[in-house]
């Protein structure tokens, strides 16, 4: 028996919804809940700063699955938005003149890096996009992914399962001398692709199907 046109549309709709991250079709209530959680995590700078860009960063962070954001909150992690250099902050002053891992030979030091993530997250406002002192698809999602990897998922990027995936797909997102060398960087960048928007999500699914499935299963 041939299915009706309405049934076909319904089946196709279900398939499309199931193939994208939760954030891509989250309702306004879910997004607002994520923003409420972020209001307890994100620390804005004092003084003058680009409030529109800072709010845009928060909006992009709100795409992340709420269970990760809640876990960060429960672990008392703060995402600090900065109006100036990372190393101008007292807590990161010790990084002045230090060359970051993977940046050897670039002539760059932490003074030039717009963000960091792990046990803490710090992000320069206005440096979200690729080419703004970094090669990540999105600064805030990439660095927050490091914190989720380390704090929430117990360094899952170092797990045998992920390393097997990394061995097959770690060079598939470009920047092979960085993403293709460090599993934790490939995890963070893949996470950013997964949650940034529908276009980047689709690119990840096409280029790195095993990584995509890995992230999809983690979010369940």
UniProtKB/Swiss-Prot annotation:
Q: Tell what triggers its expression.
A: Expression is controlled by a type I c-diGMP riboswitch; elevated levels of c-diGMP repress transcription of zmp1.
Q: What is its EC number?
A: 3.4.24.89
Q: Which GO terms describe its cellular component?
A: extracellular region
Where found?
Secreted
Question: What transmembrane ranges does the database entry give?
Answer: none
Q: Identify the stretch annotated as signal peptide in this record.
A: 1-26
One biological-process term from Gene Ontology? Answer: proteolysis
Activity regulation reads:
Is inhibited by the chelating agent o-phenanthroline in vitro.
- Give me the ranges of the annotated region Interacts with substrate peptide: 101-103, 117-119
Entry's Pfam families? ATLF (PF07737)
Catalytic positions are: 143 (proton acceptor)
Write the record's keywords in alphabetical order, separated by commas. Hydrolase, Metal-binding, Metalloprotease, Protease, Secreted, Signal, Virulence, Zinc
UniProt catalytic activity: The enzyme catalyzes the hydrolytic cleavage of peptide bonds between two proline residues
Q: How is the cofactor bound?
A: Binds 1 zinc ion per subunit.
What residue stretches are annotated with the ATLF-like domain? 35-220
Annotated Zn(2+) binding lies at 142, 146, 178, 185
Spell out the subunit comment: Monomer.
Q: Which family does it belong to?
A: Belongs to the peptidase M34 family. Pro-Pro endopeptidase subfamily.
* Record's comment describing the protein's domains: The structure of Zmp1 is similar to anthrax lethal factor (LF) metalloprotease domain IV. The S-loop of Zmp1 undergoes large motions upon substrate binding and seems to exhibit a function analogous to that of LF domain III, thus contributing to sequence specificity and substrate binding. An aliphatic-aromatic network and the diverting loop contribute to Pro-Pro specificity.
Instruction: Report the function annotation for this chain.
Output: Zinc-dependent endoprotease with a unique preference for proline residues surrounding the scissile bond. Exhibits a high preference for an asparagine at the P2 position and hydrophobic residues (Val, Ile, Leu) at the P3 position. Efficiently cleaves the LPXTG cell surface proteins CD630_28310 and CD630_32460 at multiple cleavage sites in vivo. Has a role in the regulation of C.difficile adhesion versus motility by cleaving surface adhesion proteins such as the collagen binding protein CD630_28310, and is important for efficient infection.
* Protein name as catalogued: Pro-Pro endopeptidase
Source organism per entry reads Clostridioides difficile (strain 630) (Peptoclostridium difficile)
